[in-house]
């Protein structure tokens, strides 16, 4: 397997991880970090954050131990701005705003959102209609909890399309994509965005393929609001 490298720096790279690929070593598989190291022809790369197996999109891998410590700290201290895209078929309780609450383990490897806010998962979002019974969510997680966005979407009454663990409709993939990362790296402003891998339809997903032009228009509109 060859991974798409969307950004390369002397200290780190950013790949576009396909959905269905675990960042951890599965029992029968070679781990993602080993595969990327082999692709680059280097002894090792370092994982500094994680994406769920079902999530596609931007994943940073450090190329040396010092960079790994720096980037891991930035993620831990919420110094890296993240933007995710999700699709859902069910109408949300609200169309934009903030989802906040503590997260507790539930059954079958799932998590649930609680009303308490001692150490809350925080996600800001806006949404736009793409078609009847299909809605785009642009999400800005302010924390980095396990399954945070998937749980937030379920709490809105709009589980992610394809995310059966949280009640989403069956689809060809889970429609959650890590679209953009923005951060300062020793005075260098790094901002990276990447679409799903359109050249491989199975990895991208049919709905991202069909509606990407409309999705890009909404992303452009949201970016203009922040300027």
What residues fall within each predicted segment?
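Glycine- and acidic-residue-rich catalytic/RNA-contacting loop of pseudouridine synthases
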Residues: 21-34, 70, 87-135, 151, ...
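Residue-level signal for inorganic ion chemistry
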Residues: 16-17, 60, 86, 125, ...
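Pseudouridine synthases involved in rRNA/tRNA modification
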Residues: 1-3, 7, 11, 18-22, ...
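A short alpha->loop->secondary-structure connector
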Residues: 31-32, 75-82
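Short hydrophobic/aromatic beta-strand micro-patches
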Residues: 61-63, 87-89, 140
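Short, solvent-exposed secondary-structure boundary/capping segments
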Residues: 133-139, 204
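Glycine/acidic-rich beta-strand-loop module
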Residues: 42-77
């Amino acid at each position: 397997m060859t991974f798409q490298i969307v950004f390369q720096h002397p200290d780190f790279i950013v790949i576009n991880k396909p959905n269905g690929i675990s960042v951890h070593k599965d029992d029968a598989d070679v781990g993602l970090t080993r595969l990327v190291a082999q692709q680059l022809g280097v002894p090792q790369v370092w994982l500094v954050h994680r994406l769920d197996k079902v999530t596609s999109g931007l994943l940073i891998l450090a190329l040396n131990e010092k960079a790994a410590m720096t980037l891991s700290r930035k993620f831990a201290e919420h110094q890296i701005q993240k933007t995710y895209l999700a699709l859902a078929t069910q109408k949300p309780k609200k169309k934009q705003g903030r989802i906040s609450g503590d997260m507790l383990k539930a059954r079958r490897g799932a998590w649930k959102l609680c009303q308490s806010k001692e150490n809350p998962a925080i996600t800001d979002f806006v949404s736009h209609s793409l078609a009847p019974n299909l809605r785009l969510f642009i999400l800005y997680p302010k924390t980095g909890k396990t399954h945070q966005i998937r749980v937030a979407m379920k709490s809105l009454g709009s589980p992610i399309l394809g995310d059966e663990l949280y009640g989403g409709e069956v689809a060809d993939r889970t429609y959650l994509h890590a679209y953009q990362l923005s951060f300062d790296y020793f005075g260098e402003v790094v901002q990276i965005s990447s679409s799903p891998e359109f050249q491989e339809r199975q990895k991208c997903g049919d709905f991202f393929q069909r509606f990407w032009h409309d999705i890009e228009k909404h992303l452009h509109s949201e970016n203009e609001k922040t300027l």
